[in-house]
Amino acid sequence: MNAHKLTHLKQLESESIHIFREVVSEFERPVMLYSIGKDSAVMLHLAMKAFYPGKPPFPLMHVDTTWKFRDMIAFRDRRAQELGLDLIIHVNEEGVRQGINPFVHGSKKHTDIMKTEGLKQALDKYRFDAAFGGARRDEEKSRAKERVYSFRDRHHRWDPKNQRPELWNLYNGKINKGESIRVFPLSNWTELDVWQYIYLEDIPIVPLYFAAERPVVERDGMLIMVDDERMPLLPGEVPMRKKVRFRTLGCYPLTGAIESDAATLPEIIQEMLLTRTSERQGRLIDHDQAGSMEEKKKEGYF
């Protein structure tokens, strides 16, 4: 096709599909890290297109911290069943036995043990050598400098000072035994691109992205939704019902909502056109310390 006749979304779609096919042709045991959010929804849709009329030749994998929103878990199970895809759910059982949770142990320790260590356990257990993720360069500064093929050593660590050049659409996938890569087909997409594509392709997403009245408490400058009975309320804290939605989704105690009236996709897109803040501002794990995301990625985080 002539690139000059493609819309920018079709160009992004074509690039992402090319990346999926390249990885499947080069690696023995790929997997898609399915975190249930909007980026995962788009990534899954692109994977279905890339291998149509067949199904993607790799499973989905969700590293479950046990603290995701209930709506996310219900959506995950329903979507995998609808599409007839293999879904691997991995939980760091040692972390569960230790009672690790974000309220008692804080966001950093919770993320390190239940997400990062859980992910490394799963990759080792199933011997995956390539893992697709939905990260985008516009999300956060450490992700802005990460390549589409992000190489990890045998301990799953990332070295930002030792990345391979990527010229045009040429990717070097050679790895040594025990090494692996993380692959980001949405690297060049923006948050607005994602929402426009969801609208144009009619992609199902978790209802939490749409504004609705929900029980929240204001804590550390963020609106935290009271999603289940495990959330301890501080002295004098009373949940309020506010019309909110989420720009990003993670563990519910670590994810801030925003007040919004955007209850449809066109309204969300209009909101995105006017916003001047990053979606990651609603993720407490990004505020642990300066450069916290880069440090997490060096240790094996998504």
UniProtKB/Swiss-Prot annotation:
Family of this protein: Belongs to the PAPS reductase family. CysD subfamily.
Organism (species): Methylococcus capsulatus (strain ATCC 33009 / NCIMB 11132 / Bath)
Alphabetized Pfam families for the sequence: PAPS_reduct
Known pathway: Sulfur metabolism; hydrogen sulfide biosynthesis; sulfite from sulfate: step 1/3
Name the UniProt record assigns to this protein: Sulfate adenylyltransferase subunit 2
Keywords: ATP-binding, Nucleotide-binding, Nucleotidyltransferase, Transferase
GO molecular function: ATP binding; sulfate adenylyltransferase (ATP) activity
Catalyses which reaction(s): sulfate + ATP + H(+) = adenosine 5'-phosphosulfate + diphosphate
Subunit description: Heterodimer composed of CysD, the smaller subunit, and CysN.
GO BP terms in the entry: hydrogen sulfide biosynthetic process; sulfate assimilation
First-tier enzyme category under EC: transferase
Function: With CysN forms the ATP sulfurylase (ATPS) that catalyzes the adenylation of sulfate producing adenosine 5'-phosphosulfate (APS) and diphosphate, the first enzymatic step in sulfur assimilation pathway. APS synthesis involves the formation of a high-energy phosphoric-sulfuric acid anhydride bond driven by GTP hydrolysis by CysN coupled to ATP hydrolysis by CysD.
Superkingdom of source: Bacteria
EC number per UniProt: 2.7.7.4
